[in-house]
């Protein structure tokens, strides 16, 4: 039995939906445009922005790559965001993080128009999300839910344990599982008896950024294991879960790479295709 939950496979289907949608738009004389802002030259952010651009172009979405010098003032960055907010040709705005230390990330992200905030970064966007109002979904948590649903894994009534409480993954994912009527426990560095808590999980999600931290002793027989973590070990990308050790015990498991991460950028681009929600 194949136990692999492949984000790559699910992404192929979603890319097809996006491509069909943008082709229909262009046939009617319309188009979609995303503006992506990079401040400085962080290697990871440069790579990610280039990857975003390539995927967007392949899917028929216009992509504006904005590179700003690391020394740019906070005021000038704010002016650039306000300019994009007012530009009706721009359907979505992405601001790559982290920002240089002299720029207040909270102030700047809060300037992004919530109707264009593809990454759900601003406090208005986050407020809409937690109140259940219409907004762009946080992409990594959305990737987890999308992957489970694509494989027809029942969520309602299930016991879900999330290890990690970050604002980017753990907390919004907690809310999304609640919305699916799961019973959810969030674990963190102060959680006592972590193994015992994890062993209760029908669905175990790990998002802590510690390579190979979770082994089979944390997993109940037949659990679904979702690995959100990515770390570099000896030049290779590795997840938070010791894949080889956990594989036999899990009923289904995501690989790293090839799992959740394979979906995130695709879903980010899908965010701008509002009619596909």
UniProtKB/Swiss-Prot annotation:
It catalyses: (6R)-5,10-methylene-5,6,7,8-tetrahydrofolate + NADP(+) = (6R)-5,10-methenyltetrahydrofolate + NADPH; (6R)-5,10-methenyltetrahydrofolate + H2O = (6R)-10-formyltetrahydrofolate + H(+). The gene is folD. InterPro entries: Aminoacid_DH-like_N_sf, NAD(P)-bd_dom_sf, THF_DH/CycHdrlase, THF_DH/CycHdrlase_cat_dom, THF_DH/CycHdrlase_NAD-bd_dom. Homodimer. Its EC number is 1.5.1.5, 3.5.4.9. PANTHER family: C-1-TETRAHYDROFOLATE SYNTHASE, CYTOPLASMIC (PTHR48099:SF5), C-1-TETRAHYDROFOLATE SYNTHASE, CYTOPLASMIC-RELATED (PTHR48099). NADP(+) binds at residues 164-166, 189, 230. Pathway: One-carbon metabolism; tetrahydrofolate interconversion. GO terms for biological process: L-histidine biosynthetic process; methionine biosynthetic process; purine nucleotide biosynthetic process; tetrahydrofolate interconversion. Disulfide bonds: none annotated. SUPFAM superfamilies: Aminoacid dehydrogenase-like, N-terminal domain (SSF53223), NAD(P)-binding Rossmann-fold domains (SSF51735). Belongs to the tetrahydrofolate dehydrogenase/cyclohydrolase family. Keywords: Amino-acid biosynthesis, Histidine biosynthesis, Hydrolase, Methionine biosynthesis, Multifunctional enzyme, NADP, One-carbon metabolism, Oxidoreductase, Purine biosynthesis. GO terms for molecular function: methenyltetrahydrofolate cyclohydrolase activity; methylenetetrahydrofolate dehydrogenase (NADP+) activity. One of its GO terms (cellular component) is cytosol. This is Bifunctional protein FolD. Catalyzes the oxidation of 5,10-methylenetetrahydrofolate to 5,10-methenyltetrahydrofolate and then the hydrolysis of 5,10-methenyltetrahydrofolate to 10-formyltetrahydrofolate. CDD domains: NAD_bind_m-THF_DH_Cyclohyd.
């Amino acid at each position: 039995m194949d136990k692999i939950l492949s984000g790559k496979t699910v992404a192929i289907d979603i890319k097809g939906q996006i491509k069909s949608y943008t082709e229909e738009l262009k046939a009617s004389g319309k188009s979609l445009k995303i503006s992506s802002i990079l401040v400085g030259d962080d290697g990871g952010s440069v790579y990610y922005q280039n990857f975003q651009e390539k995927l967007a172009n392949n899917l028929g979405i216009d992509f504006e790559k904005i590179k700003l010098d690391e020394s740019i003032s906070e005021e000038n960055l704010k002016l650039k965001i306000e300019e994009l907010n007012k530009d009706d040709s721009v359907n979505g705005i992405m601001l790559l993080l982290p920002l240089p230390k002299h720029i207040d990330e909270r102030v700047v992200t809060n300037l992004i128009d919530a109707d264009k905030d593809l990454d759900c970064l601003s406090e208005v966007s986050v407020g809409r999300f937690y109140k259940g109002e219409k907004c762009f979904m946080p992409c990594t948590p959305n990737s987890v839910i999308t992957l489970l649903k694509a494989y027809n894994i029942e969520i309602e009534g299930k016991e879900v344990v999330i290890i990690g409480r970050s604002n980017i993954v753990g907390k919004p994912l907690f809310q999304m599982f609640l919305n699916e009527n799961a019973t959810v426990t969030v674990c963190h560095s102060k959680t006592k008896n972590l193994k015992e808590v994890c062993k209760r999980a029908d669905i175990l999600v790990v998002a802590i950024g510690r390579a190979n931290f979770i082994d089979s002793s944390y997993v109940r027989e037949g659990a679904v294991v979702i690995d959100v973590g990515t770390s570099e070990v000896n030049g290779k990308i590795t997840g938070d879960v010791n894949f080889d050790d956990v594989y036999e015990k899990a009923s289904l498991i995501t690989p790293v790479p090839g799992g959740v991460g394979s979906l995130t950028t695709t879903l980010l681009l899908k965010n701008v295709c509002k009619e596909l929600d």
